[in-house]
């Protein structure tokens, strides 16, 4: 079970809303989000309703302003609690439809360029666990939640290009 609290103002001030499940539309509860407190679980925040727009991965902790979660604005319109899995395994491919060179990961990777010798991934398969993919190295830049399943081309995980810099397992330690 997860718990997250959204605050309209920075520093955990102003009107707030507490949440423990996925929400496809948070607009009725607050007009802007400038700080967040994650009491438990791992969460993905979305700038738009229905789990669309820029994504932001948050784990337990305090985020006193939206820049702390690498947000571009104070817009949070939907959220998803990410289920925790015991093991993690993902396969990345250099071409669409699982073609070309493949590499499998079971651990976090801060620099795909260093491990894979290129930084464009056109398809992938999440075999176990949930992952967050970043378009820059060292877990920076645009973020994409990857749940178990097949992603035949980068559009399938919501990216506008094939650039991948790093990836991280979704893990929450209680």
From Swiss-Prot:
SMART domains: XTALbg. GO terms for molecular function: structural constituent of eye lens. Keywords: Eye lens protein, Repeat. One of its GO terms (cellular component) is cytoplasm. Residues 84-87 are annotated as: Connecting peptide. InterPro entries: Beta/Gamma-Crystallin, Beta/gamma_crystallin, G_crystallin-like. Residues 2-40, 41-83, 88-128, 129-171 form the Beta/gamma crystallin 'Greek key' domain. Detected in the superior olivary complex of the auditory hindbrain. GO terms for biological process: eye development; lens development in camera-type eye; lens fiber cell differentiation. It comes from the Eukaryota. There are six different gamma crystallins identified in mouse lens. Has a two-domain beta-structure, folded into four very similar Greek key motifs. Belongs to the beta/gamma-crystallin family. Crystallins are the dominant structural components of the vertebrate eye lens. This is Gamma-crystallin D.
């Amino acid at each position: 079970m997860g718990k997250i609290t959204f605050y309209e103002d920075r520093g955990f001030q102003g009107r707030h809303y507490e949440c423990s499940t996925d929400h496809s539309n948070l607009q009725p509860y607050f007009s802007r989000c400038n700080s967040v407190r994650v009491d438990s679980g791992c969460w993905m925040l979305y700038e738009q309703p229905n789990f669309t727009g820029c994504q932001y991965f948050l784990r337990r902790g305090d985020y006193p302003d939206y820049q702390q979660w690498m947000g571009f604005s104070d817009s949070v319109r939907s959220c998803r609690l990410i289920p925790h899995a015991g093991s993690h395994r993902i396969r990345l491919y250099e071409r669409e439809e699982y073609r070309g060179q493949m590499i499998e990961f079971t651990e976090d990777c801060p620099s795909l360029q260093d491990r894979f010798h290129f930084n464009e991934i056109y398809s992938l398969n999440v075999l176990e666990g949930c992952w967050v993919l970043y378009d820059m190295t060292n877990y920076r830049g645009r973020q994409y939640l990857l749940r178990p399943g097949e992603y035949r081309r980068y559009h399938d995980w919501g990216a506008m290009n094939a650039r991948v810099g790093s990836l991280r397992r979704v893990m929450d330690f209680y």
